[in-house]
């Protein structure tokens, strides 16, 4: 019987079985940022240990950096100390660090693929829950905690429990105006925020195969919001077209050999899965969240569910969400006023995201009273967007064009909500207080839907605001 990509990668990287049932896995690529690494380096120092394989470890700064004014020292002394600690630790241990102004600084899950560090068949670890993003390339990528960051630094291995594999097919063709962000919100809505517990998600089907790599990254990025620690797509020619020529990818004859090797990681046609579910692409509409979990989502033309329509176990969280968001059961989501619009994060801050929005935003203006930010995912993305005139389109429309970083996705930098502001956001989490204010509200949606909300001043259908649009 054939094997899944997950099984092949696991078996190839398994060093040994541990007594507790876990496996010790070799990690091909370890990505670091400034928030979860200082304590890990401190523990390493206390133990008198060095980084085992510095050449397999790469770092950047993203979570705490201001996106408006990056003049040092930062106004936040804690943020400045985190940056300085990362500079010191990477220099001391001989680790490549993509610092501010290097041309390659950015959100860790944007720069890994962008530089070609992320490759098929790899095991990848990072002290960040959205490490599953890298699975878009056919890698098995884990988000890990600080003590595990220490372990990987010291041994280049990780103790992990083998997961079951669920195949998620999305068949058919996405309708105009429907994007990968809508797909993953739709999947989480139907499978649940805990539906993926104990599973790795393998995404496939004709709609996924038709996606470009940056759309696949969006899909895999939010696997963790659906409870799955790992999400991946089998590598194919789309993967290779994206990777070819990137700085850390093999060149010449080695490139041809790498492609053959990478194709062998694909799940076999007769692979056995622990579960298989299928969705029709045509049934997926532009989707937005209405509550305080990514699973509390509805189509843009939908209404917030009545409590009696929900399974009994979901009602307490729904009641909590309604109270926090200030919504009513049965209320249409379209037309809800917004105060802030945010395009960015490791989910949707790549060049293709910005290109797609600029394509339709040109000639439109942000509604008076709406604060709109666009934060490129990396310095490379920002530079290309400037060169292509994308940044100017955003500026002319009334968006603030910021420097790269995690920005409003989380409350670790100056970009925050105030009071009970409602933010239309292309990020991945809508938890209570996620954007800094204990009363701030987040509604998740695709980047183009965020732009539509910014222009309309309310949650709106991008297909109506901008006219007929094409799927990507």
Question: Where would I find each of the regions flagged by the language model?
Answer:
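Fe-S-dependent hydro-lyases/dehydratases of central metabolism
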Residues: 1-472
């Amino acid at each position: 019987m054939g094997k899944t990509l997950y099984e092949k990668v696991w078996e190839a990287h398994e060093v040994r079985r541990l007594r507790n049932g876990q496996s010790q896995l070799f990690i091909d690529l370890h990505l670091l940022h400034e928030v979860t690494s200082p304590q890990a380096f401190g523990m390493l120092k206390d133990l008198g240990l060095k980084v085992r394989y510095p050449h397999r470890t790469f770092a950047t700064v993203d979570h705490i950096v201001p996106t408006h004014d990056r003049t040092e020292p930062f106004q936040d002394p804690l943020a400045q100390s985190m940056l300085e600690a990362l500079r010191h630790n990477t220099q001391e241990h001989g680790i490549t660090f993509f610092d501010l102004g290097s041309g390659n600084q950015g959100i860790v899950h944007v720069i890994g693929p962008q530089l070609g560090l992320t490759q098929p068949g790899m095991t990848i670890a990072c002290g960040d829950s959205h490490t599953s993003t890298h699975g878009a390339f056919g890698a098995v990528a884990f988000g890990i905690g600080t003590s595990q960051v220490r372990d990987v630094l010291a041994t280049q291995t990780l103790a992990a429990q083998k997961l079951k594999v669920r195949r998620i097919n999305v068949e058919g063709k996405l309708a105009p105006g429907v994007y990968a962000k809508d797909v993953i919100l739709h999947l989480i809505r139907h499978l649940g925020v805990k539906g993926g517990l104990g599973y790795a998600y393998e995404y496939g089907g004709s709609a996924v195969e038709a996606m470009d790599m940056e759309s696949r990254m969006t899909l895999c990025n939010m696997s963790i919001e659906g409870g799955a620690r790992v999400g991946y797509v089998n590598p194919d020619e789309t993967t290779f077209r994206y990777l070819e020529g990137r700085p850390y990818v093999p060149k010449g004859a080695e490139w041809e050999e790498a492609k053959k090797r990478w194709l062998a990681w694909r799940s076999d046609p007769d692979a056995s899965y622990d579960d298989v579910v299928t969705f029709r692409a045509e049934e997926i509409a532009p989707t937005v969240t209405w509550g305080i979990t990514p699973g509390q989502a509805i189509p843009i033309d939908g209404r917030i569910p009545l409590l009696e329509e929900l399974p009994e176990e979901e009602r307490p969280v729904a009641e909590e969400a309604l109270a926090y968001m200030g919504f009513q059961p049965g209320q249409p989501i379209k037309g809800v006023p917004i105060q802030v619009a945010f395009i960015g994060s490791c989910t949707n801050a790549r060049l293709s995201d910005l290109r797609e929005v600029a394509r339709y935003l040109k000639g439109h203006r942000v509604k008076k009273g709406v604060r709109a930010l666009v934060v490129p995912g990396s310095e490379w993305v920002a530079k290309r967007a400037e060169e292509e005139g994308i940044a100017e389109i955003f500026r002319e429309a009334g968006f603030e064009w910021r420097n790269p970083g995690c920005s409003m996705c989380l409350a670790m930098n100056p970009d925050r909500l105030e009071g009970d502001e409602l933010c239309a956001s292309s990020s991945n989490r809508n938890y209570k207080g996620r954007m800094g204010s204990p009363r701030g509200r987040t509604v998740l949606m695709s980047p183009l839907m965020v732009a539509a909300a910014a222009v309309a001043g309310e949650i709106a259908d991008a297909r109506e605001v901008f006219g007929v649009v094409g799927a990507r």
